[in-house]
Amino acid sequence: LVIDTLLESFAPEELGFTLDTYWVQMGGADVCSWIEKLSDRIPCVHLKDMAVKGWDPIMAPVGEGNLPWEKILQTLEKCGKTKYLLVEQDVCQESPFTCLEKSYNYLSSLGYK
């Protein structure tokens, strides 16, 4: 994989990544495995959830889709290098402010503020 070549060619302080939970899942990969693989290279993470409407994947507020958030957040804490968790939702099924509030409330219920 190209990413493996990048990891071998550059030190963590020379090359970092912004991991996007939705797109890792959409690509068919395991989010926690990628967090572990890039553990010392992810200063920020885009938190996006994935739900299914009919047969189609859609973006959802964090906590309303099928991503294992408690496991993801525990894995990030274990790796200990991520400074910023950024709630992001490219496409909203309702008001973006409502979606942001739902994501915030869910993450707050897990102790994140």
Q: Which residues make up each language-model segment?
A:
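Histidine-acidic metal/acid-base catalytic patches
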Residues: 1-19, 23-113
